[in-house]
Each structure stands twice: as C-alpha cells, then as structure tokens.
C-alpha cells in the first residue's frame, strides 16, 4: 500500500518548446504516476523567462500544480497559464490618459504604444492574440531597453536594465507576491555573481538559494527524489546539494544515456559518462538506479561489481510507455518502410536510403517514408535525388506519429546507439516488423531476431557499403520470405509490457520496496 501523503520529486533544470529525451521521460513518468495516484512534483531551476514556464510544461503534459520552479518557489504566486489581458494592462497603466499612441499593428506578437512626451515606448507581447492575453511587456527609452515585466494571471517578475548604450545588461530582477509586494530581489553584478535579497535574509549564490528550497521542501521518510539532471548550470551545483540534503527521503538515479565509453573501458578501468560519474561513485547514497532496458541493467550491474565491488539496486523501468496498442484502421500499405528520428548524422539515415535503393531493384513497389527534422535534411534530399529515388523515398518532416505507424508494414533503423528508442517502442506498439543492427540498447530490446524482424550483425569498423548491404538484404527478406502476419503479432505481444498500466506497476513496485527498505 502506498503511503497516502508521499511525494515523488523529479529534479530537472530547464525546459523549452523542443525538448530532449529527459523531458519526454519525465512526461511519460508523470502519466505513469497519475495511473497509480502518486503525487509527483517536477522541479525546474533554470531562469526561464523567455516564456511563461506554465506554457512549456503544459505542452509536455504536466499539470500546473506539479511544477516547482526555483524562482517562483519563494513567492505565493501559483504556476499558471498566461490569462492577463492586454485591456487590463492598458487600463491599469492609464495609457490612454497619458496619451500613448498605439502604432500600426503588423499582426505580429508585439504591439507598440508610444509617447513623445514621456520619450517612452511600451511593448506588450501577446501570449494568445485571439484571447487578448499578454505574457511580457518591454519598456524602451531612446531605443534602449530599460525594463521588462512578466505576466501569468498577474505580474510575477520584472527585470531592470543598466540602459548602457554599448553594454545593456540586467542589473536586478524583482519577483512578486500575488498582492504586488516584492518577495525577493535578485541582484547581478555583471561578473556572474548574484545576490538574492529577502526582507530578512540574503543568499549569496544560486546554490545557496537552491539549498534553502530543498530545506523548505521538508522531505519525509516516504518521499522519493528522482535526480534526472544535475550540475549543467554554471551557477548551480544542484546534484551535490541533493546528495547532501535528500535525507530522510530516498534518492533514485535514472540513467538516460549510455552510461560509459566503451572505447576507454577495459578490465582495469571504466570511463563513466561524465554526466553520471558522480552518481556512480557515490552509490552508497543511492537507494536505486533505474535504467530503461534489461540489457543496460545487466551491464551496469557487472561493472559496479567489478570496478566498485558494489551491489547497488538497479531496476529496469522503460522511459516511455504506450497508452494502448494501435491496430490498423485499414490494411497497411504493401512493401512500405518507415523510419523516424532527428535527421542527424548519428542516425545513419543515409545507410537506410542506400539500402532501400538496392532493395528496390528486387522489390519493385518498395517505399520508404522518413519522418523528422534536422541538420542533415538537405544532404539526405540530395542523396535521394542522386539515386533517382524521389518517387519512392520521401522526407515527410516533423509530425505526430501516434496514428501514423499503423499505416506501414515495417520499421527500419540505421542508428547505432539508442538509449531506449521511443520511436522503436511506438513502432512495435503499432505492430510493425522491425529491421535494425544488433547494438545497445533499443534495437536489442525491441527486435527479436527472426520473430518480429531482423537484428543484424554490426561491427563499427566495417565499411558503410557492407552495413548498407546487410540492411538491403534484410529488407528483401522481410518482404519476400518473412511471414509478416506473424512478425506483426510478435511485435504486439512484445509491446504489451510497455503499456502505461504495466510500466506504472513497475514504478509502484519500486516505490513500495523503497518505502519498506
């Protein structure tokens, strides 16, 4: 039985519109915790002022009341969407009485109100034009930015600038309470030093402020702290603080990447991934490590034993999950391949294109659709055109793929390293057959060789043409010899354990164990 008032705190740093795997992992975890009624909080500590943080977190499916933001924590304003109206701002600041003139509106996010008498331009920024809501207002004097206000349902912060012509920078910021009083002031000296001034106390660094937040959170013995990201912010050593101040709560470390460098690891030494070195060497403070795949768990277990003579608890819990299995609404397109990833060099989509061109000579109605965006896009398009393959290989851009996979027969991956591979999980959840190399950890997790697809031998120093040849042979085999119906069934059965309800059970089990440890 879960303790009624326990909380799981998930520690992150920043969040943006385009998020990385860590934020997606947290978003899926939030779903799993909802499934089992566990109270979860997500702590962000970056200075996020470009957007209202509530817009960014809601975009990834978090509830506003799950968010703790360091800079908001010491105020009584809630994390909430931007509902403050432009009309309210204009009235409160008497812009009409002060003879401010609204400049011609260019349909952009920003409006300009100008007063010749006050030599001031006021620039409100729409959050949602149709609703008439704003999230920022900038004040400009003589073409110099002098201050900026930030709004959610009320004004929550203001930053003041030096106004220097050559080096205009923020001098201090005020963070407010709901009644408009100043909760605290952040002073900046331009050299990277900060001071946080409260009515009855000062904190002389962001690290001190963060420590104060941890103490005020007042962790209980049943609470759990999941440390997703640490020490990437130059002003903050949050990881060490959490190691020092997590008690009496239990500390859990998820591993979001390959955790060591195999090129520099042998029987005598291991080179840990530098994002995880601290967490692995301070294993005595860690109640459990969580990895996404059994394969990674086996490896980390043997390395901890060999190099640290340690036997820490390591659990496998997938970083992603499927709400439900997706069955095709109409028959899948015959001889169709799909791949989905960032269009980046390490995904080796060029190998997949070359392999498809070769296989197309045998399977004449073969098609490949490539989803995703990235820096390699134009190079990949050139490669398709050079091979006269525009009619059957297409770059499809960025799309929500939840209901797209089901239209295809087979998923193909060129990537040589996926920590987990969310797109692989989505593909088996839509019953596709799978083709990819036998590399850690994603392909080895989602491809059962000869059962739901082909897991191909791989050695780094083979030539590209050999790798492309292996992919091409697998494509041909998949569409000419394989029993695709049985491959599809096997993918669905493999996907079962990744259903949200089943992933939630694994969290439930881990949390239960930690509470009774």
Which ranges hold each PLM region?
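Nucleotide-activated donor-binding/catalytic signature segment of Leloir-type glycosyltransferases, i.e.
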Residues: 379-398
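C-terminal alpha-helical cap of glycosyltransferases
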Residues: 473, 477, 497-517
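Aromatic "clamp/platform" in nucleotide-sugar-dependent glycosyltransferases that forms part
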Residues: 416
């Amino acid at each position: 039985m879960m303790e009624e008032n326990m909380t799981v705190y998930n520690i992150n740093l920043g969040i943006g519109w385009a998020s990385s795997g860590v934020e997606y992992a947290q978003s899926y975890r939030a779903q799993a915790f909802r499934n089992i009624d566990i109270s979860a909080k997500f702590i962000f500590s970056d200075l996020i002022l470009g957007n209202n943080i509530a817009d960014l977190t809601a975009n990834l499916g978090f509830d506003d009341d799950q968010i703790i933001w360091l800079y908001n924590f010491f105020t009584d304003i809630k994390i909430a969407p931007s509902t403050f109206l432009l009309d309210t701002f204009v009235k409160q600041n008497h812009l009409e009485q002060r003879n401010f003139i609204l400049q011609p509106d260019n349909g952009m996010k920003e409006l300009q109100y100008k007063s010749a008498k006050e030599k001031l331009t006021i620039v409100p920024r729409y959050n949602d034009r149709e609703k008439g809501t704003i999230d920022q207002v900038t004040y400009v004097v003589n073409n110099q930015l002098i201050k900026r206000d930030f709004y959610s349902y009320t004004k929550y912060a203001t930053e003041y600038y030096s106004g220097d012509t050559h080096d205009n920078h923020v001098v201090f910021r005020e963070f407010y309470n709901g009644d408009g009083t100043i909760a605290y002031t952040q002073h900046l000296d331009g050299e990277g030093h900060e001071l946080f001034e409260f009515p009855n106390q000062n904190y002389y660094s962001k690290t001190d402020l963060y420590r104060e937040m941890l103490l005020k959170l007042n962790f209980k013995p049943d609470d759990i702290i999941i440390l997703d990201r640490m020490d990437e912010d130059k002003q903050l050593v949050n990881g060490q603080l959490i190691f020092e101040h997590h008690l009496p709560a239990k500390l859990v470390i998820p591993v979001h990447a390959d955790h060591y460098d195999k090129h520099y690891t042998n029987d005598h030494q291991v080179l840990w991934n530098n994002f995880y070195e601290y967490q692995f060497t301070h294993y005595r403070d860690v109640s459990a490590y969580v990895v996404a795949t059994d394969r990674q768990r086996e490896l980390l277990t043997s390395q901890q034993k060999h190099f640290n003579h340690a036997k820490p608890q390591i659990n496998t819990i997938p970083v992603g999950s499927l709400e439900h299995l997706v069955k095709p609404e109409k028959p899948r397109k015959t001889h169709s391949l799909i791949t989905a990833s960032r269009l980046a060099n390490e995904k080796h989509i060029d190998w997949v294109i070359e392999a498809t061109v070769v296989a197309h000579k045998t399977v004449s109605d073969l098609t490949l659709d490539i989803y995703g965006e990235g820096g390699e896009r134009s190079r990949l398009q050139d490669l398709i055109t050079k091979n006269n393959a525009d009619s059957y290989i297409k770059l499809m851009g960025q799309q929500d793929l939840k209901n797209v996979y089901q239209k295809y027969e087979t998923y193909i991956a060129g990537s040589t390293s996926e920590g987990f591979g969310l797109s692989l999980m989505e593909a088996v959840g839509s019953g596709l057959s799978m083709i990819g190399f036998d590399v850690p950890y994603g392909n080895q997790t989602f491809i059962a060789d000869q059962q739901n697809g082909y897991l191909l031998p791989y050695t780094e120093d083979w030539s590209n043409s050999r790798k492309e040849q292996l992919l091409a042979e697998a494509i041909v085999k998949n569409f000419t010899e394989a029993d695709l119906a049985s491959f599809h069934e096997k993918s669905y059965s493999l996907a079962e354990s990744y259903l949200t309800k089943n992933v939630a059970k694994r969290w439930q089990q881990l949390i239960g164990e930690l509470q009774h440890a």
